């Protein structure tokens, strides 16, 4: 099966066999062989060979190509959304939203290039000071499974606009989506070697990340993999490394009159995408008061009524499956561990059908756990922490090595002003779901959540480096020579 796109041709993998499955039915969605190290070499070589011509095409030609890709995406939106739903288990409505976001972010990427990079000139005496931006060359993109179309293209599109060539290695859990997307790039007329796709698991990823022929790497995924990449590229300052990783995100609730809206925002923050967004609320901080008790009671009731189902159900669910049986098993094991440490089950996360990755929402009160593990449980499991004062809530919120997102639901602006200043996070929301973020704003975190903002509006900053120069049309002597300088005897 030809599943790798190298130098403009589809080729069969020479590595180990692997497959992806629908997380509910376990039907095979993709079957093929991983790229071998030699095929990774070929992909990097193809990108290097295509780089100079792609760079020299100029911005307008490159922009025209990504705009054609946006048009092709629009023409094939329903089909790509169906593949995303089939392979990830997310509901069709959400998969369609993902494809639409892919399309919309292309305009954001073009705007960002012109506003943040591009070329700038200013007069500097008898010269012109010029800042131009030059592409790195060949960049690797490693994508996640939770948004297998949208998030990789958040790196790929800005990289191509800047003049780089790309070698893309998707998650081994979503190879079919990656193949479909690459075929759409082919339909849009991507030149041979400018975008290359290599499929596979850890071995393929290690070969690509460690390849001496790449000039940089953009990654979205787990902190564990991101940390491994950071170690692998250590001591190579000549390579740009931009990491977007996970979070153990806090959401604080205090002094809010509209309880129904608060419940909505908590549900949206915690359980959208079956909890498989890096910005999902993992920890819900609620005051230890009768009002807090009432809020939790209503939350548990509302969460218990969230519809969970197959991606293509006629009556669309709010939540689909998590990505795999293994992921579901890990989440259930995490719940059991937290209970063994002293957590109280407010709403049990359950496997809804044996042999599937369909999980119901789970809510645990972990206030009694003195040493709460600082872990990201990537699924529909939220941990409640009760607090006595806002000082304590802030302390609990920041008690994590991560720093991606943090949120406050409160009618009191003065609390938010303090929360914004003291929260250790790259995204800080007030009275909005924690999962909400603007494509025209930087996206990323601090600490173990990442080191740069290589997608959305700020992606342009990491896809090219600035070149500063002083320029004059002719050589001319200065009005006055420096002391001690004589040009004639």
Swiss-Prot record:
PROSITE patterns in the cross-refs: ALDEHYDE_DEHYDR_CYS, ALDEHYDE_DEHYDR_GLU
Keyword NAD carried by entry: yes
Catalysis: reaction(s): N-succinyl-L-glutamate 5-semialdehyde + NAD(+) + H2O = N-succinyl-L-glutamate + NADH + 2 H(+)
GO BP terms, alphabetized: arginine catabolic process to succinate
Active-site residues annotated for this sequence: 244, 278
CDD domains named in the record: ALDH_SGSD_AstD
InterPro entries, sorted: Ald_DH/histidinol_DH, Ald_DH_C, Ald_DH_CS_CYS, Ald_DH_CS_GLU, Ald_DH_N, Aldehyde_DH_dom, SuccinylGlu_semiald_DH_AstD
Molecular functions (GO terms): succinylglutamate-semialdehyde dehydrogenase activity
Keyword entries, A-Z: Arginine metabolism, NAD, Oxidoreductase
Domain of life (superkingdom): Bacteria
E.C. number: 1.2.1.71
Annotated disulfide bonds: none
Pathway stated in the Swiss-Prot or TrEMBL entry: Amino-acid degradation; L-arginine degradation via AST pathway; L-glutamate and succinate from L-arginine: step 4/5
Binding site for NAD(+): 221-226
The protein's enzyme class: oxidoreductase
Function according to Swiss-Prot or TrEMBL: Catalyzes the NAD-dependent reduction of succinylglutamate semialdehyde into succinylglutamate.
Homology family: Belongs to the aldehyde dehydrogenase family. AstD subfamily.
NCBIfam families reported for this sequence: arg_catab_astD, PRK09457.1
Protein's recorded name: N-succinylglutamate 5-semialdehyde dehydrogenase
Organism: Sorangium cellulosum (strain So ce56)
Gene assigned in the entry: astD
């Amino acid at each position: 099966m030809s599943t790798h796109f190298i130098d403009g041709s589809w080729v069969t993998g020479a590595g180990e066999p692997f497959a992806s499955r629908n997380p509910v039915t376990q039907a095979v969605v993709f079957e093929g062989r991983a790229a071998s190290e030699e095929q990774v070499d070929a992909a990097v070589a193809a990108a290097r060979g295509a780089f100079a011509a792609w760079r020299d095409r100029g911005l307008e030609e490159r922009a025209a190509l990504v705009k054609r890709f946006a048009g092709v995406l629009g023409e094939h939106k329903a089909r790509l959304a169906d593949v995303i739903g089939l392979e990830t288990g997310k509901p069709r409505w959400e998969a369609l939203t993902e494809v639409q976001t892919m399309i919309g972010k292309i305009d954001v990427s073009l705007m960002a290039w012109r506003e943040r990079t591009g070329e700038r000139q200013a007069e500097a005496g008898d010269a012109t000071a010029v800042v131009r931006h030059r592409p790195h060359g060949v960049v690797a993109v490693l994508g996640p499974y939770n948004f297998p179309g949208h998030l990789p293209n958040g790196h790929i599109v800005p990289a191509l606009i800047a003049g780089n060539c790309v070698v893309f290695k998707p998650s081994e859990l979503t190879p079919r989506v990656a193949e479909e997307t690459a075929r759409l790039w082919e339909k849009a007329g991507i030149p041979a070697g400018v975008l290359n796709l290599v499929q596979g698991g850890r071995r393929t990823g290690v070969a690509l990340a460690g390849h001496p022929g790449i000039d940089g790497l953009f990654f979205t995924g787990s902190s564990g993999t991101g940390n491994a990449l950071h170690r692998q590229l250590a001591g190579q300052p000549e390579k740009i490394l931009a990491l977007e990783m996970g979070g153990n995100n806090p959401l604080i609730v205090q002094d809010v009159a509209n309880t129904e809206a608060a419940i909505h925002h908590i549900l949206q923050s915690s359980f959208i995408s079956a909890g498989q967004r890096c910005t999902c609320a993992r920890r819900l901080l609620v005051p230890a008061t009768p009002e807090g008790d009432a809020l939790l009671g209503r939350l548990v009731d509302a969460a218990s009524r969230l519809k969970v189902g197959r991606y293509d159900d006629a009556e669309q669910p709010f939540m689909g499956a998590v990505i795999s049986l293994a992921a579901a098993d890990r989440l259930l094991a995490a719940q059991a561990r937290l209970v063994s440490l002293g957590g109280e089950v407010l709403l049990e996360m359950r496997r809804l059908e044996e042999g599937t990755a369909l999980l119901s929402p789970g809510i645990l009160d972990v206030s009694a756990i003195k040493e709460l593990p600082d872990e990201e449980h990537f699924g529909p499991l939220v941990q409640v922490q009760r607090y006595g004062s806002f000082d304590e809530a802030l302390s609990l919120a920041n008690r994590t090595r991560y720093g991606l997102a943090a949120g406050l639901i409160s009618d009191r602006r003065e609390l938010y002003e303090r929360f914004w200043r003291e929260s250790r996070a790259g995204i800080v929301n007030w009275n909005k779901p924690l999962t909400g973020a603007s494509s025209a704003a930087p996206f990323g975190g601090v600490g173990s959540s990442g080191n740069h903002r290589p997608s959305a509006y700020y992606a342009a900053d990491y896809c090219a480096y600035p070149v500063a120069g002083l320029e004059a049309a002719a050589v001319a002597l200065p009005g006055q020579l420096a002391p001690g300088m004589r040009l004639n005897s």
